[in-house]
Amino acid sequence: MYRIRVLLVVSAFLFTSPVVAQDWSVFRGPSGDGVSEYKNLPIEWGVDKNVFWAVELPGDGWSSPVVVDDQVIVTSAVAQQPTAEKSAYDLAVVAYSLKTGKALWNSKVFVQPETAPRIHQKNSHASPTPVVHKGRVYVHFGHQGTACLSLKGELIWKTVAVEYKPVHGNGGTPIIVNDTMVFSIDGAATTQVVALELATGNVRW
C-alpha cells in the first residue's frame, strides 16, 4: 500500500522566543510525557493557516520527527519498487531546515531485502523515533539494525548484531541511559531488552 507522508511545521515553533525554546530531541519530548512548554499554540491549521511550510516525505514510516539545532529529523522506509506487492526498502534518515523546510541531508543506512521477514500491514519499516544525544543521531529499525550518525548525516557506526524474527514489526523507540541506548525486542521466539554502547554500537547486555 502506498501512503503519502507530509511533514509540516506550524507557526508556534518559529515564533517562540529563543529564551524559552527547547529542542524536542526524543519521542514525546524532553520530559518524556509529551507535554510542551510552548504557550499560545495554534489549535487550527490548514494549507494557508498557521503553517509555515510543508514537505512530502519520501517513503513510509510511523516515526515522529525530532527537532534539534534548527533541524527536523525523521526516519523513512523507501520502497525500491513502490507499486510492487513485495519490494526491497531503503531505510534512511532525513533532515530538513526548521526555518524553511529545505532538505539538508538524506542518509541511507540499511537496505531491507525482499526476503526480509514481513510485518503487519498497518506497521511500517521505520516506526521507532530517532533519538538525538550530545550531537549524535541514533536510529533504530528493529530487526533490520541500529545506527548512529552525526548531525550532518555522516554515518558513525551501524550494527545488525541483534537479530531476531519479528511478529508484527518494530515500534519501540530507544532511550538513552548513561552511555547506552536501550530498546526492547518483541520477536516471535525472543523477547528481551538490549543495551548498546553509544560510542561503538557494541552490545553491552
Language model regions located:
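Positively charged n-region of N-terminal signal peptides that target proteins for export
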Residues: 1-5
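Bacterial N-terminal signal peptides
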Residues: 7-17
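Noncatalytic, solvent-exposed loop/strand surfaces
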Residues: 18-205
